[in-house]
């Protein structure tokens, strides 16, 4: 219900069907989950985590909601207390369960801060536009027109490269 309300009717069913097919074929896969102020309890719960293990997932990427764009909802940004709780839960699950979790923002201390702009991460959208980050919907390159190396040398990606690290607080959201 929560997935369909965000992504559209039937999306959750399609996603779980795909996960079942991957599990049946013994293929390695993981999922990405976005937690908000409204859904953080359910999406980081032990019940949710265990359901992913039963469905055969090997890893999960957690992203906390970032209000981006004209239709953004800043009130959905998780509170500092919620982020702290997610931080604790993920570390406990890592120690106890056979599903590896990564927390895009809360694990910044392990990767030296922001990994965007091609430092070790970039985002390619459905149109082929190469964005510095999934949260930054701006691109000066398209994968159909440039190689990844050309993209990494573009003015936008070089500006990211030259500006990193962006701050000393590894847990500060962008």
What does each model-identified segment do?
Residues 135-174:
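Flexible mid-to-C-terminal extensions adjoining Fe-S/redox cofactors in radical SAM and related proteins
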Residues 2-117, 126-127, 131, 135-143:
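Radical SAM enzyme [4Fe-4S]-AdoMet core and its adjacent flexible, acidic
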